Amino acid sequence: MTTTSAFMLNVRLDNVAVVAIDVPGEKVNTLKAEFAAQVRAILKQIRENKALQGVVFISAKADNFIAGADINMIGHCQNAQEAETLARQGQQLMAEIQALPVPVIAAIHGACLGGGLEMALACHRRICTDDVKTVLGLPEVQLGLLPGSGGTQRLPRLVGVSTALDMILTGKQLRARQALKAGLVDDVVPQTILLEAAVELAKKERLAQRTLPVRERILAGPLGRALLFRLVRKKTAQKTQGNYPATERIIDVIETGLAQGSSSGYDAEARAFGELAMTPQSQALRAVFFASTEVKKDPGSDAPPGPLNSVGILGGGLMGGGIAWVTACKGGLPVRIKDINTQGINHALKYSWDLLETKVRRRHIKANERDKQLALISGSTDYRGFSHRDLVIEAVFEDLPLKQQMVAEVEQNCAAHTIFASNTSSLPIGDIAANAARPEQVIGLHFFSPVEKMPLVEVIPHASTSAQTIATTVKLAKKQGKTPIVVSDKAGFYVNRILVPYINEAIRMLTEGERVEHIDAALVKFGFPVGPIQLLDEVGIDTGTKIIPVLEAAYGERFSAPANVVASILNDDRKGRKNGRGFYLYGEKGRKSKKQVDPAIYKLIGVQGQSRLSAQQVAERCVMLMLNEAARCFDEKVIRSARDGDIGAVFGIGFPPFLGGPFRYMDALGPGEMVATLQRLAALYGPRYAPCEQLVRMAERREHFWTNGETDQGN
């Protein structure tokens, strides 16, 4: 084999063939179409060597087995037939691996996903390391696809149909011990002995196929299967609202394989893969994947980042505690928390303890790893321990004089190079830096709640922020596991600015008599994870509406909400889930009682609560205002690109990923259609729907947000 091959064969003295996987020039192994010839050449050598006792496939990369197939291959397909052929080629290659006459072992360390797991499933046995980096899964559904190289057929036969359905329909990734319990792997070992353990397994005679648990055998039979698939179809339809065609095809293909045999199953899998690859949903989901990958590579500015060895946090509340956790436990950086009292510090420490203890209980980490991570977090009621911090994140109340005071204190007590990053959601960063001695080192870093779950952060430089400050802050966000977008220092920044008109319109429809559950259901049907009214309950009605006056002052009446309604709700001490009183009823511990609306809400705002609009009309009214505002943000350069705008909306507020983000969605609709729809709505509901100048210009010139030079392909 040549040195440029991604697959290298070495026959050991004990007659076990070790195939090392190492894609040249890449940090991560991915499967590409051109590798098929390399693998087939190796398989030919293995078949011809009659002295071989077994084969081990192992990665030569430091922390991944195979992270999946190269998604660019799908983008190169011009039609469903070409994509189907791609799947059949993958199926054939996996069949050749499975047909080898000697035991074949997959030795897995790190990510084993998508096509990587399909290759491992084609092996006769699998063994993996107990490392936290080791995860196994089939995430193709997240790209609007299904596993196309035999995964839908081999996985149910190995782990059982219910486990396989759960894994493939959700794309969930199993850690080592979970994979062992499910029967996906045969053993879990330390990384230091992975190869030798795999070699020993390869020397053994091929063992009989694993016997499935009784429950899985019943579910695979005709009666159990019929019941299971009926329930899965119902549950999946409720979850996807029909917006993700891949889920229904996954269920069909798995059922076909079980009912009609694997040959029919493989055929159905390849056909479905080809057809799904051409759907607009898959194209949009792949575009989101490529865009997020590009954003994660974007350094934020041309300047090199400054030092980033330790971080300080001001405020130990909900946001401060969450920021401390992602900084220490995700980023591995020492964190010092300052709060005005020890209760705040203890709250922040408990926040991290609770999250880490949950990981220990679920066996994701060991107790000593929990203690090691927690030791990175310390606290104080003064600035002791802050003198050497490279960056300090402020997470105190939304009060401008207080935040300006924090800037002065940090400049006085920290190093000359220390960056001050404000977690404000509404105050201009330029105002926070107005009295700063070093305004070039002041920046916004807007996290979303809950911090440990929300993937997006907005990085907000003001007019005087230096390029190095931007680069350092972006670097920190990435270390925290976040996807950062750089946005301009204008009221509401980007995410809140496009979210508020959407929520305001939902409140306005409520005052017109539309029912809460009807409004929320309409937007969930459209593709949002929760409706706007429920979202307001979740984030806190007081918190969610606090920014409305700020935006109204900056941009005018189009940001006004029915003030009397908001005031009535807040005056009735309704803050949402956090105090158990909101638009919805809450049971014990803040749990909603089957999403039941509190009927008292209608009397409170003086309406009967009788819906007149269709779900489509409700969704259109909310979404069109969001899209119009997003176009304004693009025009005003609040965001740097359509890419950042799409990622910000998908990751920040759950804009439907299958639509690709607001800018891809507007491109799909066309600027002419956007303008016509907004004009129609403006005639019905008022000037807040008037199409912005950007859309009008684009309609006249027949332009799009995503230019012809920007494609769905990765770089």
Curated annotation (Swiss-Prot):
<keyword id="KW-0413">Isomerase</keyword>
<feature type="region of interest" description="3-hydroxyacyl-CoA dehydrogenase">
    <location>
        <begin position="306"/>
        <end position="715"/>
    </location>
</feature>
<keyword id="KW-0520">NAD</keyword>
<feature type="site" description="Important for catalytic activity">
    <location>
        <position position="118"/>
    </location>
</feature>
<dbReference type="InterPro" id="IPR036291">
    <property type="entry name" value="NAD(P)-bd_dom_sf"/>
</dbReference>
<dbReference type="InterPro" id="IPR012802">
    <property type="entry name" value="FadJ"/>
</dbReference>
<keyword id="KW-0443">Lipid metabolism</keyword>
<dbReference type="Pfam" id="PF00378">
    <property type="entry name" value="ECH_1"/>
</dbReference>
<keyword id="KW-0276">Fatty acid metabolism</keyword>
<feature type="region of interest" description="Enoyl-CoA hydratase">
    <location>
        <begin position="1"/>
        <end position="190"/>
    </location>
</feature>
<dbReference type="Pfam" id="PF02737">
    <property type="entry name" value="3HCDH_N"/>
</dbReference>
<dbReference type="InterPro" id="IPR001753">
    <property type="entry name" value="Enoyl-CoA_hydra/iso"/>
</dbReference>
<dbReference type="GO" id="GO:0016509">
    <property type="term" value="F:long-chain-3-hydroxyacyl-CoA dehydrogenase activity"/>
</dbReference>
<dbReference type="InterPro" id="IPR008927">
    <property type="entry name" value="6-PGluconate_DH-like_C_sf"/>
</dbReference>
<comment type="similarity">
    <text>In the central section; belongs to the 3-hydroxyacyl-CoA dehydrogenase family.</text>
</comment>
<dbReference type="GO" id="GO:0004300">
    <property type="term" value="F:enoyl-CoA hydratase activity"/>
</dbReference>
<protein>
    <recommendedName>
        <fullName>Fatty acid oxidation complex subunit alpha</fullName>
        <ecNumber>4.2.1.17</ecNumber>
        <ecNumber>5.1.2.3</ecNumber>
        <ecNumber>1.1.1.35</ecNumber>
    </recommendedName>
</protein>
<dbReference type="GO" id="GO:0005737">
    <property type="term" value="C:cytoplasm"/>
</dbReference>
<dbReference type="Pfam" id="PF00725">
    <property type="entry name" value="3HCDH"/>
</dbReference>
<keyword id="KW-0963">Cytoplasm</keyword>
<dbReference type="InterPro" id="IPR006108">
    <property type="entry name" value="3HC_DH_C"/>
</dbReference>
<keyword id="KW-0456">Lyase</keyword>
<feature type="site" description="Important for catalytic activity">
    <location>
        <position position="140"/>
    </location>
</feature>
<comment type="similarity">
    <text>In the N-terminal section; belongs to the enoyl-CoA hydratase/isomerase family.</text>
</comment>
<dbReference type="InterPro" id="IPR006176">
    <property type="entry name" value="3-OHacyl-CoA_DH_NAD-bd"/>
</dbReference>
<comment type="function">
    <text>Catalyzes the formation of a hydroxyacyl-CoA by addition of water on enoyl-CoA. Also exhibits 3-hydroxyacyl-CoA epimerase and 3-hydroxyacyl-CoA dehydrogenase activities.</text>
</comment>
<dbReference type="InterPro" id="IPR029045">
    <property type="entry name" value="ClpP/crotonase-like_dom_sf"/>
</dbReference>
<dbReference type="GO" id="GO:0006635">
    <property type="term" value="P:fatty acid beta-oxidation"/>
</dbReference>
<dbReference type="InterPro" id="IPR050136">
    <property type="entry name" value="FA_oxidation_alpha_subunit"/>
</dbReference>
<keyword id="KW-0511">Multifunctional enzyme</keyword>
<keyword id="KW-0560">Oxidoreductase</keyword>
<comment type="pathway">
    <text>Lipid metabolism; fatty acid beta-oxidation.</text>
</comment>
<dbReference type="InterPro" id="IPR006180">
    <property type="entry name" value="3-OHacyl-CoA_DH_CS"/>
</dbReference>
<dbReference type="GO" id="GO:0008692">
    <property type="term" value="F:3-hydroxybutyryl-CoA epimerase activity"/>
</dbReference>
<comment type="subunit">
    <text>Heterotetramer of two alpha chains (FadJ) and two beta chains (FadI).</text>
</comment>
<keyword id="KW-0442">Lipid degradation</keyword>
<dbReference type="GO" id="GO:0070403">
    <property type="term" value="F:NAD+ binding"/>
</dbReference>
